[in-house]
Amino acid sequence: MPLLTESTRILLELGDRGFLGANLGRLARVLALSGHAETAAELVSRGEAMHAEIGVDPWLVTFNDETRALIRARLDEPAYAAACERGRALAPEAAVARALDTLESATNRTRAGTG
């Protein structure tokens, strides 16, 4: 996970929206699997909005579809729609901060035995 978080920070600094959007999708998958479905929905939606601006590789569409299925299994439709709307409205910097903060909190809870 440290490499993913560090590469996400670097991509943000470089302004590489294509790979940053892909990393947001990767972080969304991790968070969906660790019980943070609303944040995951925000991130995958922000990443997809970034890719809509520049185009996207086909493998990423499949990856994000699989991530959305994980998220939808954990959220009802109103919560999912609201999280997606919030995610699309996030600035890339805010999306990265949200992803990394949530991931750090989840990791700390796991280490402490409370998550």
Task: Outline where the language-model segments fall.
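Intrinsically disordered, low-complexity regions
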Residues: 1-115
